[in-house]
Design a protein with these regions (language model features):
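Short basic-aromatic helix/loop recognition motifs at nucleic-acid
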Residues: 73-76, 101-108, 118, 232
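Short, amphipathic alpha-helical "recognition" segments used to contact nucleic acids or chromatin
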Residues: 110-122
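Short, conserved non-catalytic motifs in the polymerase core
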Residues: 97-108, 297-302
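Charged, often Cys/His-bearing segments associated with DNA-binding zinc-finger transcription factors
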Residues: 1-100, 157, 363, 382-390
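Structural recognition of short helix-loop-helix hairpins that underlie histone-fold modules
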Residues: 86-103, 124-126, 321-331
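Short, well-ordered secondary-structure "scaffold" segments embedded in the functional core
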Residues: 127-129, 133-390
Length: 390
């Protein structure tokens, strides 16, 4: 009798085990099906055609809803210059050409993609912020920005980031002579751009006196705010002097390919121009600095005039940040190469605006987002750091 009871107990245990395994399997299947449901992509009908028609009627129609000065204020550039950039970018990169998708639906127009890119550059807005008006998704906005800035560099970089030609040098020399600095070709300084999404492993290298990761821009600008030289990409642990030693600003002069620069001061002939700089820069013949703790009227007057003219590059930094708020606030992209493309493209378009509005007196004061911190030019000496190439 004991053997029969033990066998029945074994059968019962097997039954319970099979039932338990079945319950566990059903729960796992339920979890899998639930997770699949949560991962399904939500398709939004953004009514792209209506978005394009509204955008076209607002700004690009023969009789637009908003006049030209509204366009200039909101896009940071004139409509004629925008259309010039638009046509060149569409011709250069077929990504911006309107196409149909696999389902036969008409995609975004070139105006929508380029407008989204310009709004992100001009306002420093997130990719999702332009969706409700332009009717463009976040991932498409990010891709449009990356392709747009790369197209700007490839199309206009050679012309609008060129070294001064003979005609440019003659005009700069005349301009400097009128300001009391014969031989001056511009002023040089550095600016830091905060990198919000700097990888943790790199933060020590990119952190300097700002106490947060930054990337340095070295620039040379003239009185009309044209940026003649831009060197971007060194970590923020460097100072202006470290950047200068790695910069190609004097590369053409060292190779003997610089444009001729002849002028006379106190009956002495000179054939090499110079830049105005602040006190951290070295005592080179191509750099003219102020006189610290100046004594006497002559020295005080020279220091005052030098410090006044040297602010051209700081004004250029301020106008660049006003026109393109994306370089005023912290950089949110992950790759240094993308940040470099954005900075370079903004400088190119800044120079295009300077050329387009050279004879116009326009207000460059734009409404800023108070939540975006101000990026100040660098004037403090910091520790040396290693260089990280893109």
């Amino acid at each position: 009798m004991s053997s029969s009871s033990s066998s029945s107990d074994d059968e019962m245990m097997k039954t319970f085990f099979i039932m338990g395994a079945a319950v566990v399997e059903e729960e796992e299947q339920g979890k899998d099906s639930t997770s699949v449901q949560h991962k399904r992509r939500i398709v939004l009908h953004r009514y792209r055609l209506e978005g394009h028609n509204r955008l076209f009627q607002d700004y690009f129609a023969d009789t637009p809803t908003y006049p030209l000065h509204y366009f200039r204020r909101r896009f940071r550039i004139s409509r004629s210059l925008f259309l010039r950039i638009h046509d060149a970018v569409v011709e250069h990169d077929k990504y911006f050409v309107q196409k149909r998708n696999g389902a036969g639906q008409l995609g975004l127009s070139s105006l929508q993609k380029i407008t989204a890119a310009m709004r992100m550059l001009a306002y420093g807005a997130s990719a999702d912020a332009v969706d409700d008006y332009v009717r463009i998704g976040k991932s498409t906005s990010l891709e449009s920005v990356k392709r747009f800035v790369r197209s700007i560099i490839n199309i206009f970089g050679e012309e609008y980031l060129r070294s001064p030609t003979n005609e440019d040098v003659a005009r700069l020399l005349e301009e400097g002579s009128q300001r009391g600095f014969p031989g001056m070709l511009g002023s040089i300084d550095c600016m830091h751009w905060v990198w919000k999404n700097c990888p943790t492993a790199w933060q020590g290298m990119y952190t300097g006196h700002f106490h947060e990761p930054t990337i340095i821009l070295e620039a040379v600008a003239s009185k009309d705010l044209w940026i003649w030289h831009a060197f971007f990409g060194l970590p923020g642990s460097h100072n202006d002097l470290n950047v200068l030693h790695r910069s190609p600003v004097f590369a053409q002069l060292a190779e003997g390919r610089a444009s001729p620069c002849n002028y006379t001061v106190n009956a002495h002939e000179y054939n090499m121009g110079y830049y105005l700089a602040d006190g951290i820069y070295p005592e080179w013949s191509t750099l003219v600095k102020t006189i610290p703790a100046s004594r006497g009227n002559k020295h005080k007057y020279f220091a005052q005039q030098q410090e006044s003219a040297r602010k051209d590059v700081e004004r250029a930094f301020g106008v660049l940040q006003a026109r393109f708020a994306i370089v005023r606030g912290p950089g949110r992209f992950w790759q240094p190469s993308v940040l470099k493309d954005i900075m370079t493209a903004c400088i190119i378009m800044h120079n295009m605006i300077v050329e387009d509005e050279r004879d116009c007196q326009l207000d460059n004061n734009f409404d800023f987002n108070d939540s975006i911190p101000v990026v100040e030019p660098s004037h403090v000496q910091t520790l040396k750091g290693s260089i990280d190439e893109d």
